[in-house]
Amino acid sequence: FNEKIQWMKLNDHEFKYHIFADKIAVKKYISKKLNSNILIRTYGVYNSYDDINFDELPDSFVLKCSHDSGSVVICEDKRQLNHEKTKKKLNRALKRNQYLQGREWAYKGIRPKIICEELLRDEDGELPKDYKVYCFNGNPKYIAVFYNRFHRGGAEHVEGVYDTEWTKQEFSFDWNWGIADFTENRPEKLEEMLKYARCLSRGMMQSRIDFYLVNNRVYFGEITLYTVGGFSGTVPDDMDEKLGKMIRTQTYE
């Protein structure tokens, strides 16, 4: 699996991948390709932290950069936001070249900006679970449900993996993510998420399409083209070979 991801970085280059990796451009693509109703509300796009007028923002929101991974800042109460710490994190992220770090081709040339979005909450007022649909050759195969992704309250970040019939699988896409010891109820909007994932992954050897489900409404999260940058520690080990065989590269070789 990892070797195939590395191969994709070096050989599978289509212009639309730049759009998918750009958190601003992909929203425009989704709006035209699918349905703007599945997009998380955007409050603003900024060239720098100093450009943000926090008086115009709601009490809660999410800040992140448009060109990278891992720069997310969750603000639940802007009166409590540590501006010094947040500015330092985002300024560091704005200078980061995601392409040079891991040679993930899709990130090459994306202009870095800061995007501010609505903070989604589930019916219990908590951050919603992530539904990550892993697609192979344009077909959804597995759905990983992420819990406690941001380790709130020190909780462990765990993952539950299911097939498209919602049968629980006993593996994880990365050893850094614990395997959930419980079974998640089949989401009512599963077929809708799979439909969107099938449409967005068409023509790609492997991709991951992320969604949130809030108040029984599907929201698009992001498209990931290189799972864990091609350095995932799949558990158990034999799943790495099985997943790798699911990626067909013959068309390009």
Q: Each PLM stretch: what is its role?
A:
Residues 46, 67, 118-120, 135-137, ...:
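Short, flexible loop/turn elements at secondary-structure junctions
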Residues 57, 81-176, 182:
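Phosphate-binding site of ATP-dependent enzymes
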Residues 194-201, 208:
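A conserved acidic, glycine/proline-rich C-terminal tail/linker
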Residues 12-18, 181-186, 198:
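Active-site rim elements
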